[in-house]
Amino acid sequence: MTLTFVDSWPIYLQSITFVVALIIGIICLVKFCDIFVDASSTIAKKLHIPELIIGLTVVAIGTSCPELAVSVSDSITSLLEHSNANVAIGNVIGSNTCNLLLVLGFSAVFTPIVVKKSVCKLEYPFLLGVSALSVLFVVLFGTGSSITGNYAILRLEAIILVVLMFVYIWFLIHNAKKHPEDKLDEKESELAETKEKDMKLWVAIVLVIVGAAGIIFGGEAVVFGAKGLALQVSDAAHLNHDLAESLVGLTIVAVGTSLPELVTSVVAAKKGQNELALGNVIGSNIFNILFVLGIAGTVNPLTTGSQVIIDAIVMMVATVVVFGFALTGKIKRSGGISLLVMYAAYLTYLIVRTVM
């Protein structure tokens, strides 16, 4: 990995720079994503686009902006440096696993999550399907070499994911029009917040540009900090560099980019609207796979090492376990504790895998 201007700095100063870059990057991603979504929603409303479509597209995709910025940035970096995209793939898999185990776990511990029957019949089976498809793409159809890695999301596979994303958006809009009583309440509440911020069109356009620039900067900063920390840790402890990068992507970066979902779910729990938590997680995980992996893989095929097999399987197992809880109609506190224990066990495994 090329670190350019910090190469000649003292090690301790490099470490501080990487940590600060990572923190500032995550803060920028969270804050500027909010600005981007609010301004984009305002522009859409000024253009008389139905609020339902705004909620199911602009707002939904906006929640995946942090993951997209990080993964695309790492995808470009891997293209320029002929290296693996460990952070890009680790970010998506780690974020989805974090959403399922940490976010839902915390939410259920606060207040048991009530699950609508329609979720188990429509949205969640779709999440199971796209999760399984992504695992198949990475594990069964990946290609590799000594340079690019053992497993990959190829460009054709990424394009398929993007196409499926548009199919999913069409399905959401079609289903919402067919069953208006089942509109996504959480998206409507988010739109209600943007209504209160009645801004002029030119202001909204400027804020969209500012938000997009902030998201790009945040993504670059996160990747710079994450890769720098991974390089330092792997060099200092004589660890496998790919494993160190994967560890950072699956933990620090994944949790950081999942902060919007975590905050939204905890706030919903405190307001007694905990049933929104599962819907937020399902939507976020679907968009992470189809939108983030799809776009990043289209920019440049995403390659990584064989460790991705276990990580992808853990994500799939977490998806199935949560579905099992959801089928009972409620994720109880005991279920939430179980999810948190699973996440703690997975983090322990990641650390042990990296240092062994």
Predicted segments — roles?
Residues 1-356:
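Hydrophobic alpha-helical segments, chiefly the membrane-spanning helices
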